[in-house]
């Protein structure tokens, strides 16, 4: 991306995107029949949904989406790098008439979510993150009556065959909840990344945060967070990983004394030659 970390973190640049499709496998025969987008404006989240009532409306849906893509530099999705965006690129290619306006940057929040919360939660599905990380009571809605994603394609096929449009209301609601959850998740992740010390007390979350900063090349910050994670307490396996990462960072920064001390601890505790 041509944008700096600071520019990526500006909510005014974000366009949230989520699609509902005729299949979950992707491929040239899969359509995005509902494309939802959202953005922050005037202190609130604006949500817009483009619905394809029949296949001949695909061009209009993609044109409307393209106009929105032109207005924001940073596309924000959840698993969008693997699913939503490749699918939309395929649909743009199939219609031929429209060239997609590729965003300057694409933030797929699935990846930082895995780093931050998979060790604690196991599943990092958006609905799980809403419940256990974001807090449904703070969000102002719950997924209690939400529809299962696997049922959505059939509801659309039934509608195309002349069925009642009423079941689609739940699909629209599901898409809107995904967008609102995505916006809340972006705020949470960037809040963690931007805070000097972080409103974080959970050792596993601190460990995930330290790994993100480590990958971004921010060694000093990563080192401090690894130390905080160890102080907060980690499961044995993760504790060993944190010490190993700290030892590697110390060695790269020329602090051979600390690196040797950490490797010594690891060797004593794990009785593993891998520490060396």
Q: PLM ranges: what are they?
A:
Residues 1-11:
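N-terminal accessory regions of nucleic-acid-interacting proteins
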Residues 45-136:
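Conserved DEDDh/DEDDy metal-dependent 3′-5′ exonuclease domain
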Residues 194-198, 227-237, 264-271:
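Solenoid-like repeat scaffolds
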């Amino acid at each position: 991306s041509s944008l700096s970390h600071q520019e990526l973190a500006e909510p005014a640049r974000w366009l949230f995107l989520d699609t509902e499709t005729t299949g979950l496998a992707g491929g040239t025969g899969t359509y995005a029949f509902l494309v939802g987008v959202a953005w922050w404006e005037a202190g609130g989240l604006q949500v817009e949904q483009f619905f394809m009532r029949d296949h001949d409306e695909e061009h209009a849906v993609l044109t409307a989406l393209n106009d929105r893509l032109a207005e924001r530099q940073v596309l924000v999705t959840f698993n969008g790098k693997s699913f939503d965006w490749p699918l939309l690129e395929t649909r743009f290619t199939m219609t031929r008439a429209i060239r997609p306006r590729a965003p300057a940057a694409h933030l797929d929040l699935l990846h930082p979510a895995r780093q931050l919360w998979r060790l604690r939660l196991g599943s990092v599905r958006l609905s799980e993150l809403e419940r256990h990380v974001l807090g449904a009571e703070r969000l102002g809605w719950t997924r209690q009556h939400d529809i299962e994603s696997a049922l959505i394609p059939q509801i659309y096929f039934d509608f195309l065959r002349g069925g009642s449009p009423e079941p689609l209301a739940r699909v629209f609601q599901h898409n809107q909840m995904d967008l609102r959850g995505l916006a809340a998740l972006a705020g949470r992740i960037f809040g963690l990344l931007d805070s000097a010390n972080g409103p974080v007390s959970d050792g596993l979350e601190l460990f995930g945060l330290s790994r993100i900063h480590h990958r971004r090349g921010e060694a000093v910050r990563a080192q401090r967070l690894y130390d905080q994670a160890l102080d907060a307490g980690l499961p044995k396996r993760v504790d060993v990983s944190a010490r190993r990462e700290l030892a590697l960072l110390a060695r790269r920064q020329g602090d051979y004394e600390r690196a040797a001390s950490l490797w010594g601890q690891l060797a004593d505790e794990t009785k593993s030659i891998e520490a060396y």
